[in-house]
Amino acid sequence: MICNIKRRPAGGIKVGTLAVGEIVQIAVSGVMTNFIVANQGIPEDTGTGYDGSYDTSCDGTWMIAEALMDGPKIYSLQTWSYDITSWFSAMIDEKTLNAIRQATYPYYSSSGADTTTTKVTRPSVRELNYLWKYKGSTYDGAPLKYFLTHSAIMPWTGSSSEADYWTRSKSPSDPFENAIYIGDSGTAQQSDDSSNARARPLFIFEPDTRVKKVSDGIYQLA
């Protein structure tokens, strides 16, 4: 006798089908935390000077934290994206970590356009839709679609630095000593590691990752 075995379809929908601006909640230190779908696929520049340094590893669902976190400070401007991966991965479960792509992100170094390969990073100035130009016509990436229509400014709540957060972009004038952060006024500013600016994690989900709807515009991993 021949038995036809049908596989049950996987629950939920693919995160790669969500609209930019929708929310995926993941547990961070046991607390459901909102992450915004910031882009689907490889970001496309809407200006001039993009150095084209995204590769296929970035062809997924870009997620950015809705709120700031007290993450690690910039330390002597070494490879801080590795530090934020270690810090962030310690707060999430294995299922979530496995859904995040190892991706190659562009950034500006002392020698010019460069890349860093990591799972969790900080947004670049250009990804937040700022036009901070480096040598020649090089930008560190391209705008994420969410920030074409939404501000990168975080709400000011009273503390002079509570709404400030680091980018992964280094200073064009002094990349050895200064990095760029987004201030509560909305300006991109540079500072050394003495700044109390916070972290806004950015990562890319595998587009086939399944999510389930919990309310309008809000999803969780299935």
Positions of PLM-derived features:
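Collagenous Gly-X-Y triple-helix signature in extracellular proteins
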Residues: M1-A222
